[in-house]
Amino acid sequence: MGGLSIWHWLIVLLIVALVFGTKKLRNIGNDLGSAVKGFKDGMKDGDAPADAQQLPRSGTVDVNAKEATRSDSNKA
């Protein structure tokens, strides 16, 4: 009694088709499909390696150098 049978879903689908029209529903389906395709393409592009300019430089960073500069300015 709590679940909807196939007949309930068919009636709902028929009402939606009458209200919006099949052409409008087809356009909505096409728009939704192209949006999903664009999202998947964007996710593929996000996995591609970045350009050499955008990659972080590999090397060591001297964290103590900044703190040493601060200590010198506080003494003066």
Swiss-Prot record:
Belongs to the TatA/E family. Residues 43-76 are annotated as: Disordered. The chain crosses the membrane at residues 1-21. Part of the twin-arginine translocation (Tat) system that transports large folded proteins containing a characteristic twin-arginine motif in their signal peptide across membranes. TatA could form the protein-conducting channel of the Tat system. One of its GO terms (cellular component) is TAT protein transport complex. The lineage of its organism: Bacteria, Pseudomonadati, Pseudomonadota, Betaproteobacteria, Burkholderiales. The Tat system comprises two distinct complexes: a TatABC complex, containing multiple copies of TatA, TatB and TatC subunits, and a separate TatA complex, containing only TatA subunits. Substrates initially bind to the TatABC complex, which probably triggers association of the separate TatA complex to form the active translocon. The keyword ATP-binding does not apply. InterPro entries: TatA/B/E, TatA/E. It is a single-pass membrane protein. GO terms for biological process: protein transport by the Tat complex. This is Sec-independent protein translocase protein TatA. Keywords: Cell inner membrane, Cell membrane, Membrane, Protein transport, Translocation, Transmembrane, Transmembrane helix, Transport. Its main location: membrane. It is found in: Cell inner membrane. One of its GO terms (molecular function) is protein transmembrane transporter activity.
